[in-house]
Amino acid sequence: MKILVYLEKSDVRGGIEIFAERHVARLRAEGHEVEVVDCFSEKRMTAGDFDEVVVHKCSDVATLEKLPPEKTVYYVHDHEPICPRTYAYTPLKRNCSCAGGLWPCLFCAPLCRNWKSALKRVFAQKRRIAAMGRFKKLVVISEFMKSRLVANGLSADKITVEPPVLDGLDAEAERRGDGEGSAPPRLCVEKIDLLFVGQLIRGKGVQLLLAAMSRMKTPRTLDVVGTGNMEPKLKALAVQLGLGGRVRFNGFQTNPRDWMRAARCVVVPSFWQEPYGLVAAEAVALGRPVVAFAIGGLPEACGGKATLVPPGDVAALAKALDDNCEGA
């Protein structure tokens, strides 16, 4: 089968890009002929020449409207298709559960950093939802995201839930019985108590993790794997809270799973509505204790095998970290 895949180029290789790359690799391994194209690329493809069209990321509504509905499968990885601000998080620092539309989105959009782009998305929202509603299938990564699409007027009958494939980690864990890696981790540190893996942006909640560390009964170290615009502020906050010597910022690493295998506890302190939570799912599959806020798709990603605490509750997070590190 000939398949056309739309994947908008990004400067950051995040969860969407990783998911799409793995999906394309699986399709090719199954013998399909796959062509990947950016919806803004000069390289134009005629969808009619393909048996199926798969959309992983395409912010151009005009392109979506031209795709053949009977052939198109649309993967909804995050809030962007239904939230003009893209994060389902208001400028008033509140998670948003509203259905998209002129109201209340017209209130939010002008307060965004990229307000012009946000306003354009507000006025294109109705067209985008209509285009999505015509496609033969919509695929989401969690029941939580399915509920968000239904709240925005899309038919539940068209929506399929497909959690991310973890590259054999589930089978590996099942075979060994505990999910721990057999190869020694290749790390630049000797011991990891607490581990955070992800972008250093506000919604990922590292600032709440640092606050929780300052309340823990037993001092622990934290290794941070990842980069982002919050890094300077987080380093300053660690010093301000007296944690400077116990927090290591390790930057981007190519082997995050090795870090997870070596960690006493993997922490996912996101306070925005994570569509799923790939880091949490991978850590659980590797047999690592996980502590996370119970928000968005994180409870599903953890599969009942993590310690979940109320979103934003720093005291509860500190206690959960103490409990999970006890005896270490």
PLM regions and their residue ranges:
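Short His-centered aromatic/hydrophobic patch
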Residues: V55-D60, V76-H79
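Short alpha-helical segment that forms part of, or immediately flanks, the ligand-binding pocket
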Residues: R257, P275, A280-A285, P299-E300
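Conserved acidic donor-binding segment of nucleotide-sugar-dependent glycosyltransferases
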Residues: G304-V314, L321-G327
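A conserved mid-protein helix/loop that constitutes part of the nucleotide-sugar donor-binding site
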Residues: I18, I192-R215, N229-K235
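Active-site donor-binding acidic/aromatic loop of nucleotide-activated sugar
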Residues: M230, G244-Q253, W259
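Acidic donor-binding loop of glycosyltransferase active sites
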Residues: R261-P275, R288
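Short acidic/histidine- and often glycine-rich active-site loop of Leloir-type glycosyltransferases
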Residues: A280, I295-L308
